[in-house]
Design a protein with these regions (language model features):
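Bacterial N-terminal signal peptides that target proteins for export
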Residues: 2-10
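Sec/Tat signal peptide C-region and signal peptidase I cleavage site
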Residues: 20-24
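Metzincin-family zinc-dependent endopeptidase catalytic domain
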Residues: 128-315
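Stable alpha-helical elements in mature extracytoplasmic
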Residues: 119, 123-126, 187, 269-273, ...
Length: 465
């Protein structure tokens, strides 16, 4: 037998045996739930988003189920796909969407550049990786020549304006007087509410020390449905929205080798953030978290993306595999939404792009990020003060909801969105008379008013009865 073949078969058997051994053991828990999979060699938990979503659903009865989310999203994905194909047929160039980012570096007083208090350069190396991956940049690790590979046409920019209107570099260092955050529920209960920036204007990333006893790399919060017919909205999760990543897995050794990375080396190239932000934009693991090769209509029960081949488990390492040999195509181990090593990953697909586009168009907190201007020049103090004093009354409203301002500073304009992100009213504001918003023709339900002042905006929720 060929020596190379023998080694390959032996390695495959070894990895399979390792996977079996780990599954046979008692798997670790996060958020009070047994994790679905760990790396069979290192024991690391690649992602805890599925477990986190179960935790959020238990904590908040208004948070919709995955099935309800998919039912809400499915027609919007088809609409996004139709638009993409129409644009391709006319060679139309899509506008690149900008997502403003704030990175909260959570530390315990360690000197800058020591342990969890990572340097600005390590943070910025991660932003570079995100842009390489989400833009499928040529001559970078984010490039691929797969026919279904997609440029998601999303760029991440560090915020230049903080919530008070002051200039910032988008890196928010916070001394929380706590060595580690191995208790994940403390992150939701204490850390996030104390540090989160307005999630309608900033994409929040928390970089923390999970502690030596934790093998967790990171996790994310799925997008809001922004309301479903006959169901309550789950906007209550706003102050926890974003991604949380262990500092050892944030940034790129390729770009900034001086950073503080995990010594085993396989997760030090920035793909944990690429993966977790994919979840925030609506993407699922390519295996669908269900361990089967059974596919339904439109790849249902899996990741809802037909152009990612059927996969019945999470893949680790970089070994090519075909876990569903009776289905078309081998496992797409290079997909950012699998569990493989960072250096194996290089692709989002066209159908994954459709899904992301649907979320960015229809999920209110995701859609509002695209209109945020905090990545541009610093706003005036007057603009910030005018927005900070704005409230709505009465709420709930019947025939009118009033925009209440402090002082004589009026906003410039407002837009009213329904619970699925559609514009139902808008107006420029030139006098106090424009601050009374007529709601008599609106159906009962949840609505959002985005109020603009100069380069800034503020989004408020109201209920029509």
């Amino acid at each position: 037998m060929n020596t190379t073949t023998t080694k390959t078969i032996f390695l495959g058997l070894l990895l399979s045996a390792g996977t079996f051994a780990v599954k046979a053991q008692e798997l670790p828990k996060v958020f009070g739930r047994t994790v679905k999979s760990v790396n069979p060699v290192s024991g690391k938990i690649r992602c805890a988003t599925a477990e986190y979503e179960e935790y959020l659903s238990e904590k908040d009865p208004n948070r919709v189920s995955r099935a309800a989310f998919e039912q809400w999203l499915a027609p919007k994905v088809e609409e996004a796909k139709t638009k993409r194909l129409a644009a391709r047929s006319t060679n139309a160039t899509a506008a690149v969407r900008i997502i403003p980012v704030v990175v909260h570096v959570i530390h315990n007083g360690d000197a800058l550049g020591t342990k969890e208090n990572i340097t600005d350069a390590q943070v910025l190396s991660q932003i570079t990786v995100l842009n390489q991956d989400y833009r499928k940049m040529a001559n970078t690790p984010g490039w691929n020549d797969n026919p279904v590979g997609a440029d998601l046409e999303i760029e991440f920019r560090m915020a230049k304006v903080d919530p008070s209107g002051n200039a910032t570099n988008g890196i928010h260092r916070v001394q929380m007087s706590r060595a580690t955050w191995s208790n994940e529920t403390a992150i939701d209960g204490t850390l996030k509410p104390a540090t989160s920036w307005d999630p309608t204007r900033y994409f929040n990333i928390w970089v923390v020390d999970f502690g030596d006893s934790s093998d967790l790399l990171g996790y994310a919060q799925f997008p809001s449905t922004s309301g479903l017919g006959g169901m309550n909205t789950d906007e209550g999760a706003a102050n926890t929205d974003g991604v949380v990543i262990g500092y050892k897995y944030f940034g790129s050794y390729d770009i900034y080798p001086q950073g503080n990375y995990d010594p085993d080396g396989i997760y030090r190239y920035g793909r944990t953030a690429t993966h977790e932000i994919g979840h925030c934009l609506g993407l699922l693991h390519v295996c669908g978290d269900d361990y089967t090769c059974t596919l339904g209509t439109n790849d249902s029960r899996k990741d809802y993306c037909p152009d990612t081949p059927a996969t019945n488990d999470y893949n680790y390492g970089c070994t090519p595999t075909d876990s569903c040999p009776n289905r078309t195509g081998a496992d797409m181990i290079e997909n950012y939404m699998d569990y493989t090593d960072d250096q194996c990953m290089n692709i989002f697909t066209q159908n994954q792009k459709d899904r992301v586009n649907a979320v960015l168009t229809n999920s209110i907190r995701r859609a509002s990020l695209l209109t945020s201007t905090v990545w541009q020049d610093t706003a005036s103090v007057g603009e910030i003060a005018a927005l900070n004093g704005i409230t709505l009354y009465p709420n709930p409203a019947t025939s009118v909801v009033n925009i209440s301002v402090q002082g004589n500073e009026l906003p410039d304009a407002y837009v009213v969105y329904n619970s699925i992100g559609q514009t139902v009213a808008q107006a420029k504001v030139s006098s106090n008379a424009n601050l009374a918003v007529n709601t008599s023709a609106l159906n009962n339900g949840v609505y959002f008013i985005k109020i603009d002042k100069g380069s800034q905006s503020k989004t408020l929720k109201f209920v029509k009865n």
